[in-house]
């Protein structure tokens, strides 16, 4: 997204925001997810309403509104995550950044430093508006965590203020820019994955029925009200569906981009000069390295969507959700797993520290939407439509945001 232009240089100079989120999610993910789930449930009710009459809307509009609130719960806490002005600002900032990046991408490289500031004027204005909301949280007396069970304790803004207290160059403006940067990354990560998996589910009624059966079994018939962290972990069919959707719908073809800091010579004799850029074609790897279904006489083709590809004895996850947690090999098949053949969330030290939070949020969104609402694609030219095609712009691949659905509350 050309962060050096769209977020100012704070995203490139230091990674304080990344280390704060990594520490927060590593130590307190179990304290954070209940509040996130609650926020998603409340946001769905607010955005979708309770009418039992069909209404037409963009599924992308629903998801981005819900994700903006759940992300804000983590970043700035309950005091701001239900503030409509702040949430609308976050959504506009995310969409404006994507739009600005697309314009900058179209420029020849030598023109970017000259013209990019013109394209990013609105982003600077939005950061100033965000400062009015976030600055009191950075400067307040409760910047550091105090009460162990306070839901507002586990927010990125408070941890960031604590980490950067006394660092002269870290002004409030820079810290606000970091929070807004995290906001954009979180919104797009969860939104794109949620849209993709929902498109895959809505296009396959049999998959939807199987997921609803699993939710009923795991929750004991209590629906999403009976789901805590442990129950969400036991939704192995849904987890498999998410991983399969991400496998076939990567957000970028090229990943793990880096620049050689010195001359490199590989064991094959290949030489890479200092300053050269290196990257991996992650999309091709994901689409060519599904799990081997060795004991199946007729394994599903690797280039086709198979929702429960990872819910088989061969993959190490029991098809019996009541015993799946006892399988020691299960983790390698989870949506959060990282490996040389599953690069959705990066790999090694470049792996995404927020992947557990992201997958939990995706599950909560899917469960809440499927249980509480009837959702179906609008017919296209009077005919039922299948899975919407993705939209590709250069290296970026996104689910079609223009797809319309019909929604009504379940009675």
Swiss-Prot record:
- E.C. code: 1.-.-.-
| Cellular compartment(s) | Membrane
Cystine residue pairs: none
What molecular function does GO assign, one term?
A: iron ion binding
Q: Does the keyword Lipid biosynthesis apply?
A: no
Annotated signal sequence is none
Residues bearing carbohydrate = 12, 149, 342
| Keywords from the named record | Glycoprotein, Heme, Iron, Membrane, Metal-binding, Monooxygenase, Oxidoreductase, Transmembrane, Transmembrane helix, Virulence
Q: What SUPFAM superfamilies does the annotation carry?
A: Cytochrome P450
A GO BP term here is: secondary metabolic process
Q: Which Gene3D superfamilies match?
A: Cytochrome P450
Function as written in the Swiss-Prot or TrEMBL entry: Cytochrome P450 monooxygenase; part of the gene cluster that mediates the biosynthesis of sirodesmin PL, an epipolythiodioxopiperazine (ETP) characterized by a disulfide bridged cyclic dipeptide and that acts as a phytotoxin which is involved in the blackleg didease of canola. SirD catalyzes the O-prenylation of L-tyrosine (L-Tyr) in the presence of dimethylallyl diphosphate (DMAPP) to yield 4-O-dimethylallyl-L-Tyr, and therefore represents probably the first pathway-specific enzyme in the biosynthesis of sirodesmin PL.
What is the recorded name of this protein?
Cytochrome P450 monooxygenase sirE
Species the sequence originates in: Leptosphaeria maculans
Gene symbol here is sirE
